[in-house]
Design a protein with these regions (language model features):
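His/Glu-rich zincin catalytic helix
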Residues: 1-82, 193-194
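Acidic/histidine-enriched segments that form metal/cofactor-coordinating
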Residues: 78-193
Length: 196
């Protein structure tokens, strides 16, 4: 790892320490005076926009919602268990979100920061799943998609995007559609995990 570089942001009175890790990931640390709670965020440049990309000059195309689906599945360990339970045992809260451009996994805790950080790095560093597990997750994501359809603010937002960017990935829900998530396979998820 390169040495930490300190940057001071006068307008918000914050110091940010940053470095590039040996694996190419960016690290940023912000020490918050007077705060007891600690948090860590791990982001990857893989979001809803990234369902068409080139590998070795060949176009790869995946169903809408693949990044969000992978976000869900990474919370499953090798035995099919929900890793959230491991964070709960440490007194930590863990979650994730997918945007158009990235997916972020994060946790916050008062104690056991190092152990929680190890868990975060472990569960985001490997992917294992079964077809049965993926099919089960499709039902969960389908419910999530339908829930957003009941939210007038979200429907207005998506309607604006659909009007501004018709027939593009921007006119689709970040989670995809009920139809698009039905197309997602274990192989699709593994291919995208390996790529990003």
């Amino acid at each position: 790892m390169a040495a930490l570089k300190k940057r001071y942001y006068q307008k918000i009175d914050e110091e940010v320490y940053s470095a590039i890790l040996d694996n190419g990931m960016s690290l940023s640390i912000i020490k918050k005076k007077g705060f007891v709670e600690k948090a860590a965020f791990l982001s990857t440049n893989f979001g809803a926009l990234d369902n068409h990309f080139y590998i070795d000059g060949e176009l790869q195309s995946y169903p809408a919602g693949i990044a969000h689906f992978l976000e869900h599945k990474l919370f499953e360990d090798e035995q099919g268990r929900d890793v959230t339970l491991d964070f709960v045992k440490l007194g930590a809260d863990v979650n994730a979100f997918t945007t158009l451009e990235k997916t972020t996994y994060y946790f916050s805790t008062l104690d056991h920061f190092e152990e929680s950080l190890e868990l975060l790095l472990k569960f985001t560093s490997s992917f294992t799943s079964s077809e049965d597990s993926v099919n089960h997750e499709k039902r969960i994501i389908e419910q999530e998609i339908n829930m957003y359809q009941d939210d007038p603010d979200y429907r207005a937002y998506l309607g604006c995007l659909q009007s501004l960017y018709p027939n593009t990935i921007l006119d689709q829900d970040i989670a995809g559609s009920v139809d698009s998530i039905e197309e997602i396979t274990v192989k699709d998820l593994k291919d995208n995990f390996d790529c990003f």
